[in-house]
Amino acid sequence: MYAYNTSKTFVLALLLLLPCSLLTITSAAQDEPEYKMELGGGVGLTNYLGDFNGNLTRDIQPMAGIVAKYKVNPRTAWSAVLNYGTLKGNSRNEKTYYPDYAGAPISFSTKLTDFSIRFEYNFWPFGTGNEYYGAKAITPFIALGAGLAFAKGDETATAFQMPIGFGVKYKLQKRLNLALEWMMHFSGSDRLDGVSDPYGIKSSDLFKNTDCYQGLQLTLTFEFMEKCKTCHNDRE
C-alpha cells in the first residue's frame, strides 16, 4: 500500500511539473534575443554582359563588398550593398559583326563600383530560438533593388542599375549568418564597356540595348542591436 501511494504521488508530481517545464522551455525560446541589424562583407565573382559579351561564364572577374541590413521581421529585410570589382570584354569573341570595329577590335577593362538598396524576402522565417513561430536556420530568398554603378576605364560612366536575384541564407551561429546569392544587374547605360551603341541603332527604352553585369557572392554578416523584447508585432 505504501509503495502504491508513493508511486501515485510520484506520477501526480510529474503531471504537475510537466506543464511547468513546457512553459519554461517556451518562455526560454521566446526570450531568445533578436537583433535588428546585420553588418558584414563578402567575396565573389562578376562578369560583364553587353555588346561584346553574351556569355555568362566568359571573362569572369573577382569582386568584394560590404553589406548592412535592417531586419524588419524574420521574413523581410532591407540591405545596403557596396561592391567593387572589374568588368572585362573583347569584341573578338563575338560573332556579331560591327563595321566600325572590324579592323580594330575593342578590348576593355573597367573598374566597377556598385551601390544598391535592396529588399529581401525570405521564403521561411529566418532565425533560431524562435521555433514557436516557425523560424528556420536556413531559408531561400529573393531580392530586388535599385542603385548606381560607376565604371572607370579609358572613359568613366555612371548609370542607374537595378539588381534582381535569389540566394540562400544559413545561420552559422545565433548572431552569425552566411549567405550565397546570385544577382543580375540591369543598367540604364550602354557605356559600361566604354562604347555606346555599336549597332548604330538608337533606343529610347530604359534597359534595351544597355550593358548588364552579374554577380555571385558569398557573404558573412554579424547581428547586433537587440530588439525590444516586448515588441511582438513584427513576428507576425
PLM regions: where:
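Cleavable N-terminal export/targeting peptides
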Residues: 1-34, 223-236
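Short glycine/proline- and aromatic-enriched beta-strand/turn motifs that initiate or cap beta-hairpins
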Residues: 28-69, 217, 221-227
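Outer-membrane beta-barrel strand-turn architecture
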Residues: 33, 70-74, 123-125, 170-174, ...
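Gram-negative (and chloroplast) outer-membrane scaffold detector with strong preference
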Residues: 74-156, 219-222
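Residues on the lipid-exposed face of transmembrane beta-strands in outer-membrane beta-barrel proteins
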Residues: 41-45, 66-70, 117-121, 144-148, ...
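Predominantly the C-terminal beta-signal and adjacent terminal strand-loop region
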Residues: 112, 173-236
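Residues that define the transmembrane beta-barrel architecture of outer-membrane proteins
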Residues: 35, 58-62, 111-115, 136-138, ...
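Flexible, surface-exposed loop regions and adjacent strand-edge segments
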Residues: 57-60, 95-101, 195-202
